[in-house]
Regions:
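Extended, well-ordered alpha-helical scaffold segments
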Residues: 165-173, 227-242
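Short amphipathic alpha-helical segments embedded in low-complexity Lys/Glu-rich regions
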Residues: 78-84, 193-196, 224-228, 253-259
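GST superfamily/GST-like fold recognition
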Residues: 195-222, 232-234, 240
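GST-like domain detector, emphasizing the conserved glutathione-binding G-site
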Residues: 1-196, 267
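Substrate-binding/catalytic groove segments of enzymes
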Residues: 183-188, 215-220, 246-249
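Long, charge-rich low-complexity segments
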Residues: 244-274
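Acidic, serine/threonine/proline-rich low-complexity intrinsically disordered regions
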Residues: 159-165, 219-228
């Protein structure tokens, strides 16, 4: 019988540790307090106030936008109200406590769409503007999909037919999204062509926040695989997951399954065992 090996020392373990990431100029990551993209720190006139744990979908929307546009910015983290008390310093700056917020040259803006409108004015849109006709149509579709998901996930069904109706309503809207995705051979919704190929645009950013959460929550609470049931959505998600800008913000299934109930007021499974 071989003798038990002594545990490795910290010095020995350090040899096997991964090199520390460059949080400022490297890949997108949730730990940064400053992002420069190899530009001067003097260009970082935007400060993003987001939640501590990268759980807030609307913070994620602004975060991805800044990363895709490579806009230098600073990050300050704040507690979401459904998980604890707001920091007093933040309430002095934003009395409502709303997240996300950005600060540009002492001007504070809240509401994720309003933030993106301001950023578009300064830095230009990500592909098509949020106010362009087609993007407005996509934004309405996203709200329709969100509503059908909430109705299925967050409202308890009293009998099987009610549960099935909610499921079919969600599938109907999800297929409408798939029909839109099929129109774009690149797999994106509002892509912009760059020297490196096709990148997502404004409507992609609007959709990804809650589709990421739908994918996790419906699997966990309803046993419904969004990606298997909707292959065009799956392709679109795969394309986004190849991007470091998105992947650095992406939450895992366990996180979303358990961070959503406090935010949404509850998530319900359905059992017909009775």
């Amino acid at each position: 019988m071989n003798p038990t090996r002594n545990a490795m020392s910290w010095e020995e373990l350090a040899i096997h540790a991964a090199n520390p990431i460059d949080q400022i100029n490297g890949l997108n990551n949730p730990y940064s307090s400053l992002r420069l993209f190899n530009k001067s720190e003097s260009e970082a006139i935007v400060t993003l106030y987001r939640d501590n744990h990268a759980w807030c979908p609307y913070c994620q929307k602004v975060w991805i936008w800044l990363e895709l546009k490579k806009i230098p910015y600073r990050i300050k983290k704040v507690t979401m109200r459904c998980y604890g008390d707001k920091e007093r310093w933040y309430l002095r700056k934003v009395p409502s406590g709303m997240l996300p917020a950005i600060e540009i040259e002492n001007h504070v803006i809240t509401e994720s769409d309003e933030i993106l409108f301001v950023l578009e004015e300064i830095y230009g849109p990500l592909g098509q503007s949020l106010n362009e006709t087609k993007v407005l149509e996509h934004r309405r579709l996203e709200r329709e999909l969100f509503s059908s998901w909430c109705n299925w996930l967050c409202r308890n069904s009293l009998f099987p037919a009610q549960e099935q109706k909610k499921k079919e309503d969600f599938k109907y809207v999800a297929r409408k999204l798939e029909n839109e995705l099929q129109k774009n051979t690149s797999g994106g919704r509002t892509p912009i062509t760059t020297k490196n190929g096709t990148q997502p645009g404004s409507a992609d950013i609007v959709f990804i926040l809650y589709i990421e959460r739908m994918n996790a929550s419906l699997a966990y609470y309803k046993g419904y695989s969004l990606r298997e049931e909707h292959p065009f959505i799956n392709t679109w998600l795969r394309n986004l997951e190849e991007l470091d800008e998105y992947r650095g913000t992406q939450g895992d299934f366990h996180t979303h399954a358990h961070d959503l109930p406090p935010q949404m007021g509850g998530c319900f499974t359905y059992s017909n065992s009775s």
